[in-house]
Amino acid sequence: VGVDYTSDSQIGTTLDAGRRFGDNDQFGARVNLVHREGETGVPNDRRRTTLLSTGLDYKGDNFRTSLDLGYQKKTFHGSPTSVNISAVDFVPEPPKNDRNFSQKWAYSDIENEFGMWRSEYDITDSWTAYTGLGAQHAHEEGIYSAPKLLDKSGNATVSRLDTNRISDSVSGMAGIRGNFDTGFVSHKVNVGYSAMTKNEKIAWKMSATADNPTTNIYHNTGVAMPDSSNFNGSGGKYSDPLTSGRTRTQGWLLSDTLGVLDDKLLFTAGARHQKVVIRGYNKITGAENDADGFDGSRWMPTYGVVYKPW
């Protein structure tokens, strides 16, 4: 158990507990908890983090497996993001690091749930089969207030950007690795396959330029949040975002590390075939945008030499 204190008033606590079970300690379990919140060294910048993760594993004579599950939520209120300098032709003097040019009403909530599973099985003393699977769900929703700089004095307009983003990813791998000898040459071989798919959903809406209040990035006094009833730009269905992009990758790999002179001299040769497929979709209609798509593959060689004199 731990307790920490950071900056002005950010207090946190942690818990890390684990143990092994069974006649030969073949079963294991571990739990991690983190909660931290409060104001940072920047005025009106409040942050909160919550994390829970659990790990389970089994280690037998020729079979090993593990499962990790986790949840994380990070919340930001009034946290500085960035300064938009697209309307000027100079790089401004940065504000002091104890000045907050963001607004109190700006916030961001980011949630992640994830899981990872991996297993290995020793077919013989020299050969092992392995596999793994992972998945993640992420959700970000927030109201952002990035100031748009107008002059060297630091005057800027404050826009309101509402964002709703959802991301889901699944990845997996499988393969076999082993070692054998051919005469005086040793071999360490690995053959594997991996794949990943990712689905993105995003929608946003932005306040009308005429409604954007003015502020100063060096002397921010705070402004009222622009009215949501008069947005002049939007992308997608905010309450239920449609798919905006999909990505799929897959790859085959083969490698062999050859050793001579009692493995003091090692030479590795390998190759990987990687394929990437990307699709983009209209955020409002859901129709596929051919211009945003990509479909390609390539062979990638790998080689290396290691000499160990001692």
Residue positions per predicted region:
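Residues on the lipid-exposed face of transmembrane beta-strands in outer-membrane beta-barrel proteins
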Residues: 1, 15-19, 54-58, 117-121, ...
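Transmembrane beta-barrel strands of outer-membrane/channel proteins
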Residues: 1-5, 15, 31-35, 67-73, ...
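Transmembrane beta-barrel wall of Gram-negative outer-membrane proteins
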Residues: 7-81, 105-125
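Short loop/turn motifs that connect adjacent beta-strands in outer-membrane beta-barrel proteins
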Residues: 22-27, 62, 124-126, 181-189, ...
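Surface-exposed loop/turn segments flanking beta-strands in extracellular/periplasmic regions
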Residues: 84-99, 150-156, 203-241, 288-293
